[in-house]
Design a protein with these regions (language model features):
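Segments that shape or occlude catalytic/ligand-binding pockets
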Residues: 110
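Bacterial Sec-dependent N-terminal signal peptides
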Residues: 1-22
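Extracytoplasmic cell-surface/polysaccharide-interacting catalytic and binding patches
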Residues: 18-105, 120, 124-200, 209-224
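Aromatic-lined carbohydrate-binding/catalytic grooves of carbohydrate-active enzymes
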Residues: 114
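Conserved metal-phosphate-binding beta-hairpin within the catalytic cores
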Residues: 205
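Short active-site loop/helix that positions an aromatic residue
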Residues: 117
Length: 224
């Protein structure tokens, strides 16, 4: 009996390694995710459109209007972990007082999409490495811009969404005072709610504490 136990203990790590993909990761699937949420409700992926009144979605990866030129998602949905979603809701409340609102381009991103992006564009300055997984894969990142609530129009920012130009970097100087003000506003409002802007994308905000969450590979169709 002891011999069998020792053999099992020896083989267990080998089984775990075998389950990893070619990038060395074993992203969490639906059943394991459900178990983790039961243990810790903060890990729940929340439907942002249902939680946040007035939130506008423009999920580019559910269309061909993105840097891949392909439709990556089959549904135009936006999810985030519970604390991330609640923080974004507070940002929406703060912006509403200024006559502004949030338009979301992307939020939780299944790991398989990150693999696709990497295969299309290998520069990890702009796309996440599948060897590590992304903040989006953890449900802890939001791609967004600001809109005028009266007109529904986006505020002018330094570049469009998903630009690979240096002009998209938050540190790049901006000559136009209106654009400079808009960029500073979105960064400050999100900072107040616990988000940090990505160093190469003015639209990308990571939630502080994202390291506590695992990489997920769950399709939108599997989520409520």
């Amino acid at each position: 009996m002891m011999r069998h136990v020792l053999l099992f203990v020896f083989l267990l790590p080998l089984v775990a390694v075998a389950q990893k993909n070619k990038y060395g990761l074993n992203p969490t699937k639906l059943e394991a995710y459900k178990a983790s949420v039961k243990e810790n409700p903060a890990k729940e992926l929340v439907d942002l459109e249902k939680l946040i009144p007035g939130l506008v979605l423009d999920i580019r990866y559910a269309t061909t209007n993105n840097f891949t030129g392909e439709r990556i998602y089959t549904l135009a949905k936006a999810y985030a972990r519970r604390p991330v979603a609640e923080a974004l809701k507070q940002a929406q409340v703060a912006l509403k007082e200024k006559g502004l609102g949030i338009k979301v381009f992307d939020a939780y991103r299944p790991y398989k999409a990150t693999v696709k992006f990497y295969e299309v564009y290998h520069d990890t300055t702009y796309v996440a490495s599948p060897y590590k997984g992304s903040r989006h894969n953890r449900g802890c990142a939001i791609d967004m811009t600001l809109i005028d609530l009266k007109t529904g129009q986006e505020l002018t920012m330094p570049t469009g969404y998903d630009s690979f130009q240096k002009a998209a970097w938050p540190s790049t100087p901006v000559k136009d005072p209106e654009v400079r003000k808009n960029r500073a506003l979105i960064i400050e409002v999100m900072k107040q709610q616990g988000f940090k802007v990505n160093s190469s994308e003015w639209w990308h905000f990571d939630f502080i504490g994202w390291t506590k969450y695992d990489v997920l590979d769950i399709d939108f169709e599997e989520l409520p």
